[in-house]
């Protein structure tokens, strides 16, 4: 039997009791890969778009009620969680990506009809309480790698020790279509700050 913490809180509140829940701050959930403009070699552009989250913690983290609220939108559901030091993939069309991903990687689709902007935009991840967990403002120029802009590679965060809000911390994946749900191909090639 699984007991949901929020159900217990609701029950306590119903009977006039109260308690305070202090949830850990998960600064270690990061946007780690963006495939915003796939190559036509893969097929239809929007079928292969994805975002990847990476959990730097040594324990699984529930994404229940976390959200993506700019770029694309998605509110995560109760079953959505990221394994310890693992990945979570958010896709435009999961059917396409499932052919590339390791079979055990958790995933979901973002809201229907949306796609990532091919020239750049802000991608925002928010915790369940609305606080900012991570944000990346990517572009296809101004210091950002240009190969991920329709040439096949994804945009990969180069190292978990680098600030992922900086263009210099991102590079082009070495593989067509990137590495959804797996370690980034560029990891270990740059010195963390």
Task: Please state what every model-predicted region is.
Residues 1-19:
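Alpha-helical segments with a strong preference for the paired helices of cellulosomal dockerin domains
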Residues 20-167, 172-179, 191:
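Activation on beta-sandwich/Ig-like modules and their edge loops
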Residues 1, 189-193:
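Disulfide-bonded cysteine-rich modules in secreted/extracellular proteins
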């Amino acid at each position: 039997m699984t007991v949901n913490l929020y159900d217990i809180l609701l029950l306590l509140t119903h009977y006039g009791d109260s308690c305070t829940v202090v949830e850990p701050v998960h600064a270690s959930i990061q946007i780690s890969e963006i495939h915003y403009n796939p190559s036509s070699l893969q097929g239809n552009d929007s079928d292969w778009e994805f975002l990847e989250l990476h959990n730097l913690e040594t324990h699984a983290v529930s994404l229940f009620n976390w959200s993506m609220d700019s770029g694309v939108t998605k509110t995560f559901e109760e079953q959505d969680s990221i394994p310890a030091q693992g990945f979570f993939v958010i896709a435009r069309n999961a059917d396409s990506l499932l052919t590339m991903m390791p079979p055990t990687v958790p995933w979901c689709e973002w809201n229907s009809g949306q796609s990532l902007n091919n020239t750049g935009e802000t991608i925002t991840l928010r915790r369940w309480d609305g606080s900012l967990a991570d944000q990346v403002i990517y572009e296809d120029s101004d210091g950002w790698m240009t190969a991920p802009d329709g040439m096949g590679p994804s945009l990969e965060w180069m190292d978990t020790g680098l600030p992922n809000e900086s263009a210099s911390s991102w590079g082009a994946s070495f593989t067509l279509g990137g590495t959804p749900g797996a370690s980034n191909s560029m990891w270990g090639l740059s010195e963390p700050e």
